[in-house]
Amino acid sequence: MEAAADGPAETQSPVQKDSPAKTQSPAQDTSIMSRNNADTGRVLALPEHKKKRKGNLPAESVKILRDWMYKHRFKAYPSEEEKQMLSEKTNLSLLQISNWFINARRRILPDMLQQHRNDPIIGHKTGKGAHATHLQSTEASVPAKSGPSGPDNVQSLPLWPLPKGQMSREKQPDPESAPSQKLTGIAQPKKKVKVSITSPSSPELVSPEEYADFSSFLLLVDAAVQRAAELELEKKQEPNP
C-alpha cells in the first residue's frame, strides 16, 4: 500500500511543478518582447535626435551670419580674419562657420541674389544712379562741343537779308565806276553764296544748296542796285534846265 501511494505521488509531482511554468511562459514572453522593442526604439531614436540638435545653430548666430552674407552677397567668401570675427560674435567655432557658409552658398545665396534682382526699389536706385552718371557725362561733353562764348563766336552769327533801300544806300557805287562794275558783273561768273546759320547748341554750317532761293534773292538785289546806279548816272549826264 505504501508503495502504491508513493507511486501516484511521484507521477503527479512533475506535472504539478511543470504546469505553472508552462502556463506563465507566453505572458512573460510577450512582456519581455514589448520591453525589448521599446528599448530598441529608444536606442534608434536617440542618434536621430542628437543629429538634429547638432545641425541646428542658435537663431541669433544664424541671423548674424545671414546679415553678413547679404552684405557680401556678390562675394560670399569670408577670409580667416572675418571668420574669426564672426566666431567671436556668434560664439561658434571656425569649423561650424565654414560649414554654414558652404551650405548657405548653395541654398540661401541664390534666393538672395534673385530677391535683389526682383526688388523694384533697388532696381530704381541703380537706374537712377546710372541716369545721373549719364547726365554728368553729357554735361561735361557739351562745353567741349559748344566752346567758350567770345568774339570768335560772334562772327558765326546768322546773316539775315537787309531791306532793299538800306542795301542800295550802303552799296551805291560811284557814277564813274558804274560802267566798270557792269562789265565786271557780266564777265565774272556767278558766285555761290555761303550761308551759315548757327546756334549756341549746334555750331554746324548749313550747305548753300538748302537756301538756293535766298541766293537768287541776293542776285536780284545786286541787279536793282546796278539799275539805280545807272539811273543816277543818266540824271547827272542830262543838262540842267
From Swiss-Prot:
DNA-binding region ranges: 48-111
Molecular functions (GO terms): DNA binding
SMART domains named in the record: HOX
Location of this chain's protein in the cell: Nucleus
GO cellular component term, pick one: nucleus
Keywords on record: DNA-binding, Homeobox, Nucleus, Transcription, Transcription regulation
Region (Disordered): 1-58, 127-207
Transcription regulation among keywords: yes
SUPFAM superfamilies hit by this protein: Homeodomain-like
Main localization category: nucleus
GO biological process, one term: regulation of DNA-templated transcription
Keyword Transcription on entry: yes
InterPro entries, per database record: HD (IPR001356), Homeodomain-like_sf (IPR009057), KN_HD (IPR008422), TALE_homeobox (IPR050224)
Coiled-coil residue spans: none
Biased composition (Polar residues): 10-39
Task of the protein: May have a transcription role in testis.
PANTHER family: HOMEOBOX PROTEIN TRANSCRIPTION FACTORS (PTHR11850)
UniProt record similarity statement: Belongs to the TALE/TGIF homeobox family.
Protein name per its UniProtKB record: Homeobox protein TGIF2LX
